[in-house]
Each structure stands twice: as C-alpha cells, then as structure tokens.
C-alpha cells in the first residue's frame, strides 16, 4: 500500500487526538448493538475491556509499521469470522466521527478508512 505524506499525517491526527482505549471500547459496544451475534465471543464486560486493549495493541502495531503492516492470525481458538474485523472497523469509524466531530473531515475519514482497511486485510489474510 502506498501512503502519501498527507495520508500519514491524517492518520497521525486520529491517533494523536483520541483516547484509544475509550474509542475502541465504545466501538465494541456499538458493534454488539448493531451486530449482536458478535457478542458471542465475549463472556462479559471484563472480556470486552480486555479485548479493547488487544485491539488497541494491534492498531498501535499497525500504526507504528504503517508502511509494512503484516498479516496476523487472530486467536485460533475463538474461530472468529474475519468479516467481524470489517464490522468492527466500520463501528470504529462511526465512533471516531462521534469523538472528533468536525475534525473528522472527509479527508481524515478517507485516510483513516484506508488505514483500517489495511489492518482488516492483514488480519483477514492471517486466516488463509
């Protein structure tokens, strides 16, 4: 994936202006409301908070290696449908829009969406 300097700067804006743990936890909550079948992977609220931390770690790793995001296999024992990564990315985009309000410009949204698609593709490739 080719990143322009502007796209990288826009992804950095999102990353630097948000409380990662809170945004991801809220996005997971939104995921469970909009796509209730995804909740089956979690035993309770503490599992959700723990998973939010894991998602933040994965996003941080991808952010730190934005030019070379590697495929990663999600926990085998959970048998997670890779499409759920895309659903979570969509919910994360909504949560970022809610959090950043007017700062979540179309350009910022496009750059973040490109980043989240790269991450989702890397996670999904871990299954093939």
From Swiss-Prot:
PROSITE patterns for this protein: GLOBIN (PS01033)
Origin superkingdom: Eukaryota
Keywords, sorted A to Z: Heme, Iron, Metal-binding, Oxygen transport, Transport
Expression across tissues: Red blood cells (at protein level).
Occurrences of domain Globin (ranges): 2-128
The keyword Heme is assigned to this record: yes
One example GO MF annotation: oxygen binding
Protein residues bound to heme b: 51, 74
Protein's UniProt keywords contain DNA repair: no
GO cellular component, one term: blood microparticle
Gene Ontology biological process terms, A to Z: hydrogen peroxide catabolic process
Protein function: Involved in oxygen transport from gills to the various peripheral tissues.
Family: Belongs to the globin family.
Other facts noted in the record for this chain: This fish has three hemoglobins: Hb 1, Hb 2 and Hb 3. They all have a similar Bohr effect.
Self-association and partners: Hb 1 is a heterotetramer of two alpha and two beta-1 chains.
Protein's name according to its UniProt entry: Hemoglobin subunit beta-1
Encoding gene, per UniProt annotation: HBB1
């Amino acid at each position: 994936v080719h990143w322009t300097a502007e796209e990288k700067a826009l992804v950095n804006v999102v990353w630097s202006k948000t409380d990662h743990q809170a945004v991801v936890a809220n996005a997971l909550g939104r995921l469970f409301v909009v796509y209730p079948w995804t909740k089956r992977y979690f035993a309770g609220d503490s599992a959700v908070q723990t998973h939010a931390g894991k998602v933040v770690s994965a996003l941080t790793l991808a952010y730190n290696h934005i030019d070379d995001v590697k495929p990663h296999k999600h926990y085998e024992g959970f048998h997670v449908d890779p499409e759920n990564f895309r659903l979570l990315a969509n919910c994360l985009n909504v949560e970022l829009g809610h959090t950043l309000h007017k700062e979540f410009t179309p350009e910022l949204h496009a750059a973040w969406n490109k980043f989240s698609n790269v991450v989702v593709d890397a996670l999904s490739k871990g299954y093939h």
